[in-house]
Amino acid sequence: MKCYLVVVVAALCTLVAQGSVGAPIPKPNPIEDIYASQLPDPGTTAQMAAGDSAYPLTLLASFDPNDTSALH
């Protein structure tokens, strides 16, 4: 009985392996199928004003990589 179980499990494993290898691979759409209307409109993207760069520069200037005060 144990021999039959081994044969059945081996046959099922073979069928599962063949099924997974033989599965069709979906074909992606070529780049020609992307139209200009699907791309984001550059007018709707957020743009930083020139004066807004002062705050990130202040954060960068106050950043100390050797600061270990948060570790204590």
Swiss-Prot record:
<keyword id="KW-0964">Secreted</keyword>
<comment type="function">
    <text>Core effector contributing to spore formation and tumor formation at the host plant. Modulates surface hydrophobicity promoting cell-cell or cell-surface contacts. Lep1 and rep1 interact in aerial hyphae to form a strong hydrophobic layer. Plays a crucial role in hyphal aggregation that might be a prerequisite for strong proliferation of diploid cells and for induction of the morphological changes associated with spore formation.</text>
</comment>
<feature type="signal peptide">
    <location>
        <begin position="1"/>
        <end position="22"/>
    </location>
</feature>
<feature type="glycosylation site" description="N-linked (GlcNAc...) asparagine">
    <location>
        <position position="66"/>
    </location>
</feature>
<protein>
    <recommendedName>
        <fullName>Late effector protein 1</fullName>
    </recommendedName>
</protein>
<keyword id="KW-0843">Virulence</keyword>
<comment type="similarity">
    <text>Belongs to the lep1 family.</text>
</comment>
<comment type="subunit">
    <text>Interacts at the cell wall with secreted rep1 repellent peptides.</text>
</comment>
<keyword id="KW-0325">Glycoprotein</keyword>
<keyword id="KW-0134">Cell wall</keyword>
<keyword id="KW-0732">Signal</keyword>
